[in-house]
């Protein structure tokens, strides 16, 4: 059920911070965050470590910079898979974005965050019947169909539901062999030819004809997406152009205009100093050229282009704080062991992204300096897990560390905590904090392993 605006605001009220074994008690009201030197320590002492911190001002700045270059025909839907934190989704909704959800849980999150159903699209393969029913009853903007069998299931669900209004849908095209795919775009393959995403042309055309003839379904348009974290504006624009061309061809075949073209996401951010920054101005220029004349063809002046950015908006706005619990020298190399690791931040190990990593110390009372950078040495930064995979950084140039220091890791606002494995080895789960206008608020408390034990049962036999 859709939360009212008041309910959404209430859901974001700060809560008292529990006291898990490795986290300190938090205050519930907003407080100013000092800047620059001791900010990390003040956050760590107030909310405990490990800790995820999201800069809402940075999120807003990235949203505004993207909106500024896009043609008016473009709508933005935040991809919740990047960061489904309720407060983050709510903030992006206040900034004018809709939501791209890929599960019933993400749909519930978007609704609770106050996103209007008319601005939500459900995408993703393997959508269950209960998720389809939730989307139908919620009256969302569109449900993406990825196979003929999914179309048939949705048709039956709508028929049983007895709705008078047809349910809006998008058809997803496979991009495994798309001509815009290039190996030099700096992205990660989503649709890699595995047969999981979208439909081949024959199945897509068949589904289009069936949907057009159905009294239960309303074919809005076409969806295609196959590449993530692209850093080349022309690669992104080529994909959108190919998707628009495919929508025009489909509309001509059906003899009816399409009202929505969904180009997916894929806007990337650089991980590490050697990666380029996405040229937003170039991307916007290409998009304006692509949509300039489509109202003269089988698309109409009312046709919208939907993009689903996620990582680009929130990735650089997040940082992860963990405390140094031990130091040692192994084979002549300094090693730092933290109270957090890949159970909270798996992506650096999973895909090899090079996140910025810094050692933070309290400002020295004696000399007034913060974070003495003299004599850095290649250092291994590891977590507390009993696996050799739990390494967050290798050969990181850092000065000598001491227990109690902090390590800060940047660019973790997307695909951070929720993509990791927080239950492995039963360590406490980190809290999440939002910072805006110099004030920090708890948006999700840390969770103690005891909470996981409370929902488990020992069988009677």
Please identify what each model-predicted range represents:
Residues 38, 54-61, 83, 149, ...:
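Conserved active-site and cofactor/substrate-binding residues in soluble primary-metabolism enzymes
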Residues 3, 9, 175-326, 425-427:
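Active-site loop/helix belt of alpha/beta enzymes
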Residues 126-127, 148-150, 159, 174-178, ...:
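Short acidic/polar capping segments at secondary-structure boundaries
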Residues 59, 81, 103, 135, ...:
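Conserved, mostly hydrophobic/aromatic
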Residues 1-167, 214, 218, 435-461:
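A charged N-terminal "starter" segment
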Residues 104-105, 148, 227, 266, ...:
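Short, ordered loop/turn segments at secondary-structure junctions
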Residues 286, 300-461:
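Charged (often Lys/Glu-rich) extended helix/loop segments that serve as interaction or gating elements
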Residues 75-77, 96-98, 117-121, 142, ...:
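Structural preference for beta-strand elements that scaffold enzyme active sites
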């Amino acid at each position: 059920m859709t939360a009212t605006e008041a309910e959404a605001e209430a859901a974001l009220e700060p809560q008292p911070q529990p006291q898990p074994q490795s986290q300190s008690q938090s205050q519930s009201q907003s407080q100013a965050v000092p800047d620059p030197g001791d900010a990390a320590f003040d956050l760590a002492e107030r909310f405990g470590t490990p800790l995820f911190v999201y800069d809402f001002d940075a999120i807003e700045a990235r949203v505004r910079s993207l909106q500024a270059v896009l043609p008016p025909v473009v709508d933005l839907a935040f991809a919740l898979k990047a960061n489904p934190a309720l407060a983050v989704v709510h903030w992006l909704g206040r900034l004018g974005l809709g939501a791209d959800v890929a599960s019933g849980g993400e749909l519930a999150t978007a609704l609770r965050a106050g996103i209007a159903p008319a601005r939500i699209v459900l995408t993703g393969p393997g959508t269950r019947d209960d998720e389809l029913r939730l989307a139908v009853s919620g009256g969302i903007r569109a449900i993406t169909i990825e196979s003929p069998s999914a179309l048939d299931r949705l048709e039956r669900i709508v028929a049983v539901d007895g709705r008078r209004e047809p349910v809006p849908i998008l058809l997803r095209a496979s991009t495994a062999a798309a001509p815009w795919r290039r190996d030099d775009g700096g992205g990660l393959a989503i649709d890699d030819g595995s047969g999981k995403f979208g439909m081949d042309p024959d199945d897509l055309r068949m589904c289009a004809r069936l949907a057009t003839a159905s009294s239960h379904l309303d074919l809005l348009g076409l969806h295609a997406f196959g590449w993530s974290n692209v850093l080349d504006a022309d690669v992104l624009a080529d994909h959108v152009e190919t998707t628009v061309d495919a929508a025009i061809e489909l509309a001509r075949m059906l003899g009816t205009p399409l009202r929505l073209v969904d180009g997916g996401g894929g806007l990337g951010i650089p991980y590490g100093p050697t990666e380029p920054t996405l040229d937003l101005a170039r991307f916007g220029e290409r998009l304006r050229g692509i949509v300039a004349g489509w109202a003269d063809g089988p698309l109409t002046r009312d046709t919208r282009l939907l993009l689903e950015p996620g990582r680009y908006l929130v990735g650089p706005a997040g940082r992860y704080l963990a405390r140094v619990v031990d130091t040692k020298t192994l084979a002549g190399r300094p090693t730092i062991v933290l109270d957090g690791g890949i159970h909270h931040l798996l992506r650096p190990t999973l895909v090899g992204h090079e996140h910025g990593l810094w050692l933070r110390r309290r400002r020295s009372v004696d000399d007034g300096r913060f974070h003495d950078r003299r004599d850095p040495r290649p250092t291994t930064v590891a977590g507390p897990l009993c696996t050799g995979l739990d390494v967050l950084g290798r050969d990181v140039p850092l000065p000598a560390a001491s227990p109690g220091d902090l390590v800060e890791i940047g660019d973790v606002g997307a695909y951070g905590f929720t993509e990791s494995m927080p239950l492995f080895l039963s360590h406490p789960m980190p809290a999440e904090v939002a910072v805006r206008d110099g004030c920090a608020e708890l948006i999700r408390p840390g969770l103690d392993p005891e909470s996981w034990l409370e929902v488990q049962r020992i069988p009677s036999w």
